[in-house]
UniProtKB/Swiss-Prot annotation:
Name of the protein described by the UniProt record: Translation initiation factor 1A 2
Its biological purpose: Seems to be required for maximal rate of protein biosynthesis. Enhances ribosome dissociation into subunits and stabilizes the binding of the initiator Met-tRNA(I) to 40 S ribosomal subunits.
Organism: Halobacterium salinarum (strain ATCC 700922 / JCM 11081 / NRC-1)
SMART domains, per the entry: eIF1a
Keyword Protein biosynthesis annotated: yes
PANTHER family according to UniProt: EIF-1A
Length: 94
């Protein structure tokens, strides 16, 4: 915790990253993402997250769209439910 109000310093998107919500699991290490820029993308869960970080439907994640194929993205970070609530309260996501 960063102060007494309960606000935490959260990882925010870089220039090439967007917030996204997981719509469904597509099997293996793939998910369907609804990104904040209005696009639906196929997300790939990298090996470093595959077994350590469980990603479920409805989770808020940070996604990095591919430069060469805009309809696909890598999942870079998963926010906990508490962190997602804080992002909503601060107006970063809907």
């Amino acid at each position: 915790m960063s102060d007494e109000s309960g606000r935490r310093n959260l990882r925010m998107p870089n220039d090439d990253e967007v917030f996204a919500v997981v719509k469904r699991h597509d099997g293996g290490n793939h998910v369907t993402l609804q990104c904040e820029d209005g696009k639906e993308r196929m997300g790939r869960i990298p090996g470093r997250m595959k077994y350590r970080t469980w990603i479920n439907e409805g989770d808020v994640v940070l996604a990095e769209p591919w430069d060469w194929q805009d309809e696909k993205a890598n999942v870079e970070w998963r926010y906990s439910d508490q962190d997602a609530d804080q992002l909503r309260e601060e107006g970063h996501i809907e």
